[in-house]
């Protein structure tokens, strides 16, 4: 066992040629995906440096581990690097990228570096429009509980580990597979998970949904012939693709024909309970420490992967029950005793209509007595335009809605695809009178007039609203009450 640990703990032991590489430079190092890979590499002993436009929790953690972080992009900062890793957010005219190319330093995308980490390991890659981060986190937690000591790279903070990446001492590598730029085609895992497929990031696929579906099939065919495709049969598009996949398939879902099926779903506040049914195995009662049917599906994916790897049910059930959650995935930031009574604050990353709908459904199912107040920040003008009517439909389902300006993510504004337009369209439906908040700083003075006793306040979106949610928590939602509050999560 000791030899295995030595073999798999260092990339240079798996690929001897990697010993030529001493210094790795990351352009756009502050992103969760980039930072996760960087953390694994710095823990492997590589000299690591990188740049981003601003400091954040990811860059601070990497600096604490010994990485050199530069704020801003300057061409001289790549000097001396043996390889440069670039984020998908980096434009072709970036000075560091241009300098690396001029100096003939190898330049690779994030997914290519992840593929090298995965090359000779037992890779588990989780793909899909929604649920990747939670599913990857659940799989990593199950493997950790089973003492498989995995390496993992996750797009969100795994609360139990205090990080989104970890270098393990075994042959297992569990990671998210990003379809947003089709770079997941670089990966060659042993197990691939498909959670669902919807129209998102369609600019990558030139607006062609058939091309998107075909790319997912290509991703599955990167599996070796002895690999396993774990697929959510509840998703109609995934179900449609099943006959086109020439690999062993294990399906999961609530559907009766699923190989790994959930029955008797009950949500008890933040927790979900269900009966697990698998072919040829006795039914088992399972509790997962996450709310909502969508999270039961994520748990089923983890169960399917672990069961195929012969992990004992005891470890699976314990890991799901003890799961401590992920940052910004229905994360409870506090329960505040205000001068108007108790208000619960929850923060969630979902930014696609289906994700927002799943979050709203879980909130209403777990806390049916509470009024649901949502602060929503749309993410990207293009997504708002492409899914406009879906956003109008789903955002109309809350009891009170505050809309922030669109978080552009570098995009130019698109007329008619902004928050003011959404407000007007939602108001015209006659169900809700949303409040447009032009300046985020207004929230601390606005919320005390909006919130009522017993409210569930949900901050929702993928932009900078997560930081805003924490600011609201620190400032007690704008209430000046001196009553004690309790943080529950």
Curated annotation (Swiss-Prot):
Main location: cytoplasm
Annotated organism of origin: Shewanella woodyi (strain ATCC 51908 / MS32)
Binding site for ATP: 128-134
Database matches in InterPro entries: Mur-like_cat_sf, Mur_ligase_C, Mur_ligase_C_dom_sf, Mur_ligase_cen, Mur_ligase_N, MurCDEF_pg_biosynth, UDP-N-AcMur_Ala_ligase_MurC
HAMAP family given in the database record: MurC
Gene: murC
EC numbers for this chain: 6.3.2.8
The protein's annotated pathway: Cell wall biogenesis; peptidoglycan biosynthesis
Gene Ontology terms for molecular function: ATP binding; UDP-N-acetylmuramate-L-alanine ligase activity
UniProt keyword list: ATP-binding, Cell cycle, Cell division, Cell shape, Cell wall biogenesis/degradation, Cytoplasm, Ligase, Nucleotide-binding, Peptidoglycan synthesis
Location in or out of the cell: Cytoplasm
Function summary: Cell wall formation.
Reactions performed catalytically: UDP-N-acetyl-alpha-D-muramate + L-alanine + ATP = UDP-N-acetyl-alpha-D-muramoyl-L-alanine + ADP + phosphate + H(+)
GO terms (BP aspect): cell division; cell wall organization; peptidoglycan biosynthetic process; regulation of cell shape
Protein name: UDP-N-acetylmuramate--L-alanine ligase
Gene3D superfamilies to which the protein is assigned, alphabetical: Mur ligase, C-terminal domain (3.90.190.20), Mur-like, catalytic domain (3.40.1190.10), NAD(P)-binding Rossmann-like Domain (3.40.50.720)
GO CC terms in record: cytoplasm
Source taxon at top rank: Bacteria
Alphabetical list of NCBIfam families matching this protein: murC
């Amino acid at each position: 066992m000791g030899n295995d640990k030595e073999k798999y703990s260092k990339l240079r032991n798996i690929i001897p040629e990697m010993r030529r590489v001493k210094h790795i430079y990351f352009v756009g190092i502050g992103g969760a995906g980039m930072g996760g890979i960087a953390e694994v590499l710095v823990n492997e002993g590589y000299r690591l440096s990188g740049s981003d436009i601003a400091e954040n929790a990811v860059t601070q953690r990497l600096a604490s581990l010994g990485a050199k972080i530069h704020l801003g992009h300057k061409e001289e900062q790549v000097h001396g690097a043996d390889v440069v890793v670039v984020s998908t957010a980096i434009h072709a005219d970036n000075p560091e990228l241009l300098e690396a190319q001029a100096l003939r330093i190898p330049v690779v995308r994030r997914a290519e570096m992840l593929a090298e980490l995965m090359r000779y390991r037992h890779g588990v890659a989780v793909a899909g429009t929604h649920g990747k981060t939670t599913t990857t986190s659940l799989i990593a937690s199950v493997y950790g509980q089973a003492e498989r000591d995995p390496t993992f790279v996750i797009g969100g903070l795994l609360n139990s580990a205090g990080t989104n990446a970890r270098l393990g001492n075994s042959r297992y590598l569990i990671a998210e597979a990003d379809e947003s730029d089709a770079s997941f085609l670089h990966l060659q895992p042993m197990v691939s998970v498909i959670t669902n497929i919807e129209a998102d990031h369609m600019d990558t696929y030139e607006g062609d949904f058939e091309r998107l579906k075909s790319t997912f099939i290509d991703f599955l065919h990167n599996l070796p012939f002895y690999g396993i495709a774990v697929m959510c049969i509840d998703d109609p598009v995934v179900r449609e693709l099943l006959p086109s996949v020439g690999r062993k398939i294990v399906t999961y879902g609530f559907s009766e024909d699923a190989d790994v099926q959930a029955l008797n779903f009950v949500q008890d506040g933040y927790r979900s309970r269900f009966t697990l049914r698998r072919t040829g195995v006795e039914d088992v009662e399972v509790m997962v420490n996450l709310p909502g049917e969508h999270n039961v599906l994520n748990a089923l994916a983890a169960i399917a992967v672990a069961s195929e790897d012969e992990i004992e049910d005891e470890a699976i059930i314990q890991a799901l029950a003890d799961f401590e959650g992920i940052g910004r995935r229905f994360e409870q930031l506090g329960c505040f005793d205000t001068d108007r009574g108790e208000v619960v604050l929850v923060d969630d990353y979902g930014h696609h209509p289906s994700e927002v709908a799943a979050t709203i459904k879980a909130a209403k199912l777990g806390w049916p007595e509470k009024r649901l107040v949502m602060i929503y920040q749309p993410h990207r003008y293009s997504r708002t335009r492409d899914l406009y009517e879906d956003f109008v439909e789903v955002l109309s389902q809350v009891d009170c809605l505050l809309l922030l300006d669109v978080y552009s993510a570098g995009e130019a504004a698109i007329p008619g695809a902004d928050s003011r337009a959404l407000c007007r369209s939602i108001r015209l439906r006659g169900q809700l009178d949303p409040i447009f908040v032009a300046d985020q700083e207004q929230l601390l003075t606005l919320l005390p007039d909006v919130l009522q006793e017993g409210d569930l306040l949900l901050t929702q979106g993928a932009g900078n609203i997560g930081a805003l949610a924490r600011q609201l928590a620190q400032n007690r939602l704008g209430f000046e009450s001196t009553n004690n509050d309790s943080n529950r999560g």
